[in-house]
């Protein structure tokens, strides 16, 4: 025989995600659907209290009493046991509806059916949306990205269950007002994000992307003393030209770092004592051929010191310094990147970290041009956060 009662799971309230100062980044809020079992109510109660309920609903939702009266009468005559009264109510509205005539008699005498749905809200709106993460579907509340996914085992809690009775195909109503097993709420997570810095980073990034009509971009702000990430903004462009928190580019996008790598290249050569900041390098008039491939600067700087070459971000300067020092022994230079673990993942709790790629002699990407290209940030791949982590160590005196 078909079971007429069943323990139906009750979702636990998901833990909150907070910014550094206690501001909410994500919180669980219950939403409520109120439905009506027109078959449970006695004829006398329906006749006496239904018009009062219709009037109360009409006043509260700004519709006519006759609209609700017709709905309730059709539900009664049609033997409907799951008639929708109101959807997606907040808790305040739910309490008001619950106390209206007829419904205040409860599930058996008043036909009240309450469907509680946990929903996730982000008080800061679109700011830090990708960093915080979101669920793939509202039904399963499954999280696959961001902090929501990284700390899901702690945030999700333990579901409870409630005994419900089958009243129609696919429709169930609670047997009593009490739960058989109370859900246990998830733990809260406090992040290092500073909402003021996050807000500034978000709008500064948006302004620059709009100005240059760029495809996407990211901003990460890291505290030097601790390495704590105080802001992480990611914006990608839509087909319509607007921007939104599309992907976590800072964590997931491994690409050629360009001129941001020059400092890293320079630091390795200094550490190896292969170059000196005062030595002279000829950047010529802004172009120089390396093994048949031309490298250019925006303008010529002539003969300048190695320190000045880094200061003016000269492609030719860095390529010349590194190629002259290491063309016969590139492994000496490359070993510093391995020693500094630039070729390995940071090991973040957030999934999807991009894999750094630093080629070595014998690799498919290696050629005579590899060394001068790498000196100014090409022919290798790192994520923005991996580059920033190295810069933060430099700013922190190597720690």
What name fits each language-model region?
Residues 4, 9-13, 213-216:
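Short, small/polar residue-rich loop motifs at catalytic or cofactor-binding pockets
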Residues 32, 48-55, 59, 83, ...:
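Solvent-exposed, polar/charged alpha-helical surfaces in well-ordered, non-transmembrane soluble domains
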Residues 51-59, 73-185:
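Small/polar-residue-rich segments within soluble enzyme cores
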Residues 8-63:
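Juxtamembrane extramembrane loops of integral membrane proteins
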Residues 26, 32, 166-180, 193, ...:
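Beta-lactam-recognizing serine transpeptidase/beta-lactamase-like catalytic domain environment
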Residues 28-40, 76-80, 179-189:
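Acidic/histidine-rich, surface-exposed loop or edge segments in extracytoplasmic proteins
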Residues 14-19, 23-37, 84-88, 96, ...:
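Soluble periplasmic/extracytoplasmic beta-strand elements of cell-envelope proteins
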């Amino acid at each position: 025989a078909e079971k007429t009662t069943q323990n139906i799971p009750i979702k636990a309230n998901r833990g909150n995600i907070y910014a550094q100062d206690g501001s909410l980044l994500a919180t669980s809020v219950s939403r409520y659907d109120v439905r009506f079992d027109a078959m449970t109510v006695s004829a006398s109660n329906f006749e006496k209290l239904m018009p009062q309920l219709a009037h109360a609903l009409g006043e509260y939702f700004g519709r006519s009493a006759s609209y609700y009266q017709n709905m309730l009468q059709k539900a009664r005559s049609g033997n409907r046991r799951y008639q929708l009264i109101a959807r997606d109510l907040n808790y305040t509205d739910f309490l008001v509806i619950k106390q209206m005539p007829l419904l205040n008699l409860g599930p058996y005498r008043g036909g009240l059916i309450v469907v509680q749905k946990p929903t996730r809200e982000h008080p800061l709106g679109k700011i830090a949306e990708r960093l915080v993460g979101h669920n793939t579907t509202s039904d399963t509340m499954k999280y696959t990205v961001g902090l929501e996914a990284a700390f899901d085992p702690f945030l999700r809690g333990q579901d409870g269950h409630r005994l419900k009775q089958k009243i129609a195909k696919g429709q169930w109503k609670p047997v009593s007002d009490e739960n058989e097993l109370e859900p246990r709420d998830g733990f809260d997570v406090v992040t290092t994000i500073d909402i003021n810095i996050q807000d500034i980073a978000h709008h500064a990034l948006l302004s620059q992307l709009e100005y240059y009509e760029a495809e996407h971009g990211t901003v990460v702000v890291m505290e030097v003393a601790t390495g704590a990430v105080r802001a992480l903004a990611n914006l990608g462009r839509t087909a319509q030209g607007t921007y939104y928190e599309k992907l976590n580019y800072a964590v997931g996008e491994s690409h050629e770092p360009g001129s941001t790598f020059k400092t890293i290249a320079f630091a390795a050569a200094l550490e190896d004592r292969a170059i000196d900041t005062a030595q002279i390098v000829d950047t010529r008039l802004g172009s120089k051929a390396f093994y048949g491939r031309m490298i250019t600067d925006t303008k010529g700087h002539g003969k300048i010191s190695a320190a000045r070459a880094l200061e003016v971000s000269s492609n030719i300067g860095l390529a010349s310094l590194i190629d002259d020092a290491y063309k016969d022994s590139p492994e000496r230079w490359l070993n510093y990147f391995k020693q500094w673990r630039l070729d390995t993942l940071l090991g973040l709790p957030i999934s999807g970290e991009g894999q750094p790629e630093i080629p070595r002699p014998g690799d498919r990407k290696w050629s005579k041009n590899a060394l001068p290209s790498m000196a100014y940030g090409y022919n290798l791949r790192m994520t923005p956060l991996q580059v920033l982590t190295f810069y933060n160590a430099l700013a922190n005196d190597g720690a």
